[in-house]
A protein has these predicted regions:
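Sec-dependent signal peptide recognition
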Residues: 2-9
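C-terminal motif of bacterial Sec signal peptides marking the signal peptidase cleavage site
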Residues: 16-17
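C-terminal and late-domain segments of enzyme folds
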Residues: 23-69, 84-89, 94-96, 177, ...
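Short internal beta-strands
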Residues: 72-78
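Portal/gating segments that form or line small-molecule/metal binding sites
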Residues: 81-124, 137
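Catalytic-core regions built around general acid/base machinery
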Residues: 121, 146-158
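Catalytic nucleophile loop
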Residues: 130-132, 155-176
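Glycine/threonine-rich flexible loop motifs
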Residues: 135-145
Length: 297
């Protein structure tokens, strides 16, 4: 009987490993560790808050990506319910700033259909661009796939990873899904600051120290971000307004575009309290940054 113990232990470990990957939807549970703990990546994140993206912001994105003759762009439109349309307009915006259309690849990836060519292209791209839409749709096709790893490889090796709207939300490890548990009838009007109200799922984890919200000032999402920073006091909560971006390299970032970025911090982690489902806290810090201003992550 003793000879079977090692085999039994292996089976047990495999079983536990599989169970740990099954549920990525959480409220207050800890998410699994992301690929990047400390930002040692050679690449850059170009995170846009959605809305109308100006030609000058696209030009800055292309400049940041430092595209050379043999370099190319990969567009990932899986967040959109109309990926062909999302790809068309993304490609059009790049061509309008003199990017050669032959240097632009589009992959509407499916979780179970990711070719070696597609994965290698993502790894070698100088710019990976994630369109807007629904961040949950995007992650449903990317999480625990070769494409997820390929995006991380590209970023670590020096690529620019860009996204707008939903493509911004996925940059976080703890990703705001947009789902409100307690008041779904409000349809995006975040009227309360309550505990366990906003769904958080696993994102790409390229920006593990912060949680991103987008369309921030225009859609009045302060209550949501306050709830997030109270329940996740170890993270910076960053609200990026429309037509605006943060450009992240290493542990530093700069604001670009036309509007502001709001940063919430909760340094007094032990001050968070709840009463009848309401969230409270003390000494929450807020920064309102203008285009050109820099901050540390």
């Amino acid at each position: 009987m003793k000879t079977f113990k090692p085999l039994a232990m292996i089976i047990l470990l495999i079983s536990l490993s599989c169970k740990s990957k099954q549920n990525t939807s959480v409220r207050q549970e800890n998410l699994p560790a992301g690929k990047i703990v400390k930002n040692t990546a050679k690449g850059t994140l170009f995170i846009m808050g959605g809305g109308k993206i100006s030609k000058s912001l696209i030009e800055e994105l292309i400049s940041t990506s430092n595209l050379k003759n043999d370099d190319f762009i990969v567009i990932l439109p899986m967040a959109s319910e109309e990926p062909d349309s999302a790809s068309y307009y993304a490609k059009k915006s790049f061509v309008e700033v003199q990017v050669n259309p032959d240097k632009i690849k589009t992959f509407n990836l499916k979780k179970e259909q990711q070719s070696i060519y597609q994965i290698d292209s993502i790894k070698k791209a100088s710019l990976v661009y994630i369109t807007g839409g629904d961040q949950n749709l995007f992650m449903s096709q990317i999480l625990h796939t070769p494409a997820y790893d390929a995006i991380h490889t590209a970023y670590l090796n020096g690529a620019t990873i860009a996204g707008t709207s939903a493509g911004a939300a996925v940059m976080s490890r703890e990703m705001i899904t947009g789902i409100e548990y307690k008041h779904s009838q409000y349809s995006g009007n975040f009227r309360t600051i309550e505990s366990e109200n906003f769904e958080i799922k696993e994102g790409l984890g390229l920006m593990p120290s912060a949680i991103i919200d987008q369309h921030f000032i225009y859609r009045m999402r302060m209550n949501r971000l306050l709830s997030v920073v109270l329940e996740h006091p170890d993270k910076k909560a960053i609200g990026i307004n429309e037509s605006t971006a943060i450009i992240v390299h290493g542990d530093s970032a700069v604001v670009a575009g036309e509007s502001q970025v709001i940063i919430l911090k909760n340094p007094n982690k032990n001050s968070v309290k709840t009463k009848n489902g309401l969230l409270g806290g003390e000494n929450i810090l807020i920064d309102i940054l203008l285009p050109g201003e820099k901050f540390k992550l």
